[in-house]
Amino acid sequence: MVRSAMLEISINGQPRQFDAPLSVAILLEREGLSGKRLAVEKNGEIVPKSRHAATPVEAGDRLEIVVAVGGG
């Protein structure tokens, strides 16, 4: 039986674990955030929405995810 590796990453300063392989798009889907207006920063660099599917998440990565909230 083959087990996928566990990735240890940080999301908004909180340690988390996910099965590998993982992209930003898959991470957002697993977190229930796909389709929302948000910004993703990976290790200090903004990840454009057009690159979410192609951007891998790797062990030790630090992600900041900010969800836009409407209001006034």
Give the ranges of each region predicted by the language model.
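Ubiquitin-like/PB1-type beta-grasp interaction modules and other compact soluble beta-rich domains
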Residues: 1-71
